A protein has these predicted regions:
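Generic structural signal of hydrophobic/aromatic residues within well-ordered alpha-helices
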Residues: 38, 42, 53, 204, ...
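Iron-sulfur cluster-binding cysteine motifs and their immediate structural context
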Residues: 184-209, 213, 224-252
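Glycine- and acidic-residue-rich phosphate-binding/metal-coordinating active-site segment common to enzymes
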Residues: 173, 214-218
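Short coil/turn linker and secondary-structure boundary residues
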Residues: 1-5, 30, 199, 263, ...
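Generic recognition of stable, solvent-exposed alpha-helical segments in well-folded globular domains
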Residues: 5, 9, 104, 177, ...
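Alpha-helical scaffold domains
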Residues: 50, 218-288
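Auxiliary alpha/beta "docking" domains used to position bulky ligands
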Residues: 1-178
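Short, small-residue-rich loop/turn micro-motifs
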Residues: 78-80, 208, 272
């Protein structure tokens, strides 16, 4: 099959699986400026409980070290926006664990690549690779001041997944868009964790309630307030995050519901099963 025909088949397959966008870029080394910015952030702001980000930096910056003879990266985006009455839990965590859902879909796309002799590495948020950097290069969206990937299809409400492949596929152009003079995410962050294009995890509700596994100190407890798991403020206030249609992937279309006045910890555990919240319950007991 001609490379252009293969690319079209991949696009059609991705759309049939419910992805909102798919883009292609070269499996190249991350540019020097981005590497320096990330290393500086690690030195100045990365807390001990996120030290995993300091590991495998060579692979994180160079996908050819993740997969020998890697030529291309396929980036896929899935919208997870939907209305929910539960504001104490990040929206992405109110449905089936995206790691499980997206990995199965990537396997289907990988099968198509294998038929053309490709060898692949599937990446769903657990592999050391600069997802947002390559999503930008593949034309999926741009990186906003809230440090998130912002796309035309879902604003900041994106699940990103990547396929690194040994097949050479025609790259797409980067999307020409930006935050311009907008600072809504910075202005509305409840803990002032954001500055332009940089996040301080030591102040971020999401980092404190998701990444930190040890008990919170009094100052951190004051920061998170009534939040249980994550925070969506910088996603919600972004003008690019308009009210889109429901996600095309069925597992992301509905949020779980529970009666706060009657719920017990066991009720909460039952509801959280197979969601990103399940990991939180294994490590500590949230206040519900």
């Amino acid at each position: 099959m001609h490379k252009k025909n293969l690319k079209k088949s991949l696009i059609d397959k991705a759309k049939s699986l419910g992805f909102d966008a798919i883009g292609f870029c070269e499996a190249c080394e991350v540019d020097e400026e981005t590497q320096k910015f990330f290393l500086s952030w690690l030195d100045e702001k990365c807390p001990d409980y996120m030290d995993y980000l300091k590991k495998n930096l060579d692979k994180r910056f160079n996908p050819t070290l993740l997969l020998e003879n890697a030529k291309s990266i396929i980036v896929l985006s899935a919208n997870f926006f939907r209305k929910s009455s539960e504001n104490r839990i990040a929206l992405y965590a109110q449905s089936k664990d995206y790691h499980i859902v997206l990995k199965e879909k990537l396997k289907e796309i990988s099968t198509l690549l294998e038929q053309h002799g490709g060898i692949q590495k599937l990446c769903v948020d657990t592999v050391p690779i600069m997802e947002k950097y390559f999503a930008k290069k593949a034309g999926i969206g741009f990186i906003g001041k809230n440090t998130l990937l912002i796309s035309p299809s879902a604003g900041a409400f994106n699940f990103l997944s990547l396929i690194v492949t040994t097949l050479e596929l025609e790259p797409d152009s980067e999307l020409l868009d930006s935050c311009e003079n907008c600072n809504r995410c910075i202005q509305h962050c409840p803990t002032q964790a954001l500055s332009e294009y940089s996040l301080n995890p030591n102040l971020c509700i999401s980092a404190l309630t998701i990444e930190k596994q040890t008990p919170l100190n009094d100052s951190e407890k004051n920061l998170i307030g009534e939040k249980i798991f994550g925070c969506d403020m910088c996603l919600k206030v972004c003008p690019k995050s308009k009210y889109f249609s429901l996600p095309k992937i069925p597992e992301f279309q509905n949020s779980f519901e529970y009666d706060k006045s009657k719920s017990s910890l066991q009720d909460f555990a039952d509801i959280a099963k197979n969601t990103p919240l399940e990991r939180r319950l294994k490590n500590s007991t949230p206040k519900i």
